[in-house]
Amino acid sequence: MKLRSIFRTIPILKRIYPSLFFKLSQLLNKNIFLSKFKGIYLNLDIRDPIDRSILLFDFYENKQIKYLSKIFKKNTINYFFDVGANSGIYSLVMSKQFPKTIILSFEPVKSTFKKLNKNLSLNPKLKNIKKYNYGLSNINSKLKMKALFKKNFI
């Protein structure tokens, strides 16, 4: 078991570890960290709750990703739509595990789409991902995308 997984399972460590890491990152004036999660490289921002969970505990929707992988293994999946791809975690993990599946990643928020692009660039061997800076809907129209910014993350 990885040390980060142990920190996630022991309640006192689960509370102390993030605080210490966050304080250390502030002292070093460093918020962005390169990390590996499920075989993919990610640029993670300690201020973002999803990134923080991956960075500190090697954990983000692990059960959902495992379930999705099981479905992919049982069936031939030709296309996978990652709608609201965020930073591309699902796209990248599925791409790594299933290189013959064409992955279509949709992320409408420009700043988040830039983060998706950065994470894709950290994994240059994954060639089966097509990315789009669009939102998807059942209505064909052009809308202005608004995102709430809080503590420098969306």
PLM features per residue range, with description:
Residues M1-I154:
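Phosphate/nucleotide-binding beta-alpha loop and adjacent structural elements of enzyme active sites
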